[in-house]
């Protein structure tokens, strides 16, 4: 039995910023769904440009069969250099879910993907390697009906920094995963899970996000014939 993917993404802009510095691309191939989350350095217009370029480059090259090395090299050569910091920087996660349930996950400097089965967090066995001097994590695994995969930008794990509440040093990944796990047990909807996680981030930020905050939720459901 094949699977299909119910995907929802939602973002909170950094307080007072018009543009979001995170970009999400959802693409389809003949046999898979590809989800890309890119987070540009900083915030506002510059971050938006960095993340948009990164997501578009990864999506276009990935779909055309380019290797991961070729994708990363192109990003490094293409992104505009920040005049202040003298670097071009954007983090990213790539999640490719095949119709047969196979998954390929690539992560560069983003918070770890949260993988849930029966509402419980499952640790993923990842392999790290250097690609153009950047440490990239890769993972291949199998999903089944009812599983959920959650990608987040670091605005989620930074929620609460500088505030006086419980998470004044940030919202730990483990606590984020626990929250998502509880949501997964009570809802089969990716939209509800994404909305709940974003709402919780906003509450922790006291309504004034200190960073661009993006959540992507992918629920695995039965593949239905058209």
Regions found by a protein language model. Give the residues of each.
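Small-residue (GG/TT-enriched) beta-loop-alpha framework at ligand/catalytic clefts
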Residues: 92, 101, 114-143, 149, ...
